[in-house]
Amino acid sequence: MAREATIARTTNETSIQLSFSLDGEGKAELETGVPFLTHMLDLFAKHGQFDLRVDAKGDTHIDDHHTTEDIGICLGQAIKEALGDKKGIKRYGNAFVPMDDALAQVVIDLSNRPHFEFRGEFPAAKVGTFDVELVYEFLWKLALEARMNLHVIVHYGRNTHHMIEAVFKALGRALDEATMVDPRVKGVPSTKGML
């Protein structure tokens, strides 16, 4: 069974078509209208070996908030749908990624209990025209809609771009690990018998 999903979401603020495959080749076709987010999603797909297609149109003439947040919502929904019943998955993923001066860690539990924790501070409020606070909004909506427990720690760094890049690379690697199928796992990886 293919572990993939397609999500469509239209509001008065955004229109998004998103396709996602867990068992991909790291290919991304991205039209987000938010150049820095496009760059980060490309890294996420490449380092997680996911295939990701996003066609988003939003009210970026106001700012990037709605588009960034809604792409996070759609990607989270796609991850949840692509996982199906979660039988055989590892469930947990952990990745440290350095990017020059920066070091980030992402830890995931695909528990069906959404939670988000973020530790770290970015030196700059913007990268180009992108509001750095939107990284938090994107990740929180992703965790909520994917129903994952997501912990993100930016241990240190001087360059905000490098720090965020390390986060998105680590996110891809941690999610790849958590979604891997382990032949030793019979059913779902929980003593409850369900996730």
UniProtKB/Swiss-Prot annotation:
A Pfam entry, by short name: IGPD
Which keywords fit this entry according to its UniProt record? Amino-acid biosynthesis, Cytoplasm, Histidine biosynthesis, Lyase
Q: So what does this thing catalyse?
A: D-erythro-1-(imidazol-4-yl)glycerol 3-phosphate = 3-(imidazol-4-yl)-2-oxopropyl phosphate + H2O
GO biological-process terms attached to the record: L-histidine biosynthetic process
Record GO cellular component, one term:
cytoplasm
InterPro entries assigned to the protein according to its UniProt record, in alphabetical order: IGPD_sf (IPR038494), ImidazoleglycerolP_deHydtase (IPR000807), ImidazoleglycerP_deHydtase_CS (IPR020565), Ribosomal_Su5_D2-typ_SF (IPR020568)
- Does the record's keyword annotation contain Ribosomal protein? no
Q: Which CDD domains match?
A: IGPD (cd07914)
**E.C. code:** 4.2.1.19
Localization per record? Cytoplasm
Q: Name one GO molecular function term.
A: imidazoleglycerol-phosphate dehydratase activity
**Recorded metabolic or biological pathway in which this protein acts:** Amino-acid biosynthesis; L-histidine biosynthesis; L-histidine from 5-phospho-alpha-D-ribose 1-diphosphate: step 6/9
Per the record, the similarity remark reads: Belongs to the imidazoleglycerol-phosphate dehydratase family.
Q: Which PANTHER family match?
A: IMIDAZOLEGLYCEROL-PHOSPHATE DEHYDRATASE, IMIDAZOLEGLYCEROL-PHOSPHATE DEHYDRATASE HIS7
Question: What name does the UniProt record give this protein?
Answer: Imidazoleglycerol-phosphate dehydratase
